[in-house]
Amino acid sequence: METATLITIFLSGLLVSFTGYALYTAFGQPSQQLRDPFEEHGD
């Protein structure tokens, strides 16, 4: 394969991996440990 194709595939995979990890952190198991500043200030 050409170098440009390999770089494109690598960067695409990196972007998909980062997006998946961000979604997992926001909505998966680790989200239980995140603090909610709006919950702390119940006006």
Swiss-Prot record:
It is a single-pass membrane protein. It is found in: Plastid membrane. Keywords: Membrane, Plastid, Transmembrane, Transmembrane helix. GO terms for biological process: photosynthesis. The chain crosses the membrane at residues 7-29. It comes from the Eukaryota. One of its GO terms (cellular component) is thylakoid membrane. Its main location: plastid. PANTHER family: PROTEIN PSBN (PTHR35326:SF3). Belongs to the PsbN family. May play a role in photosystem I and II biogenesis. This is Protein PsbN. It comes from Cuscuta reflexa.
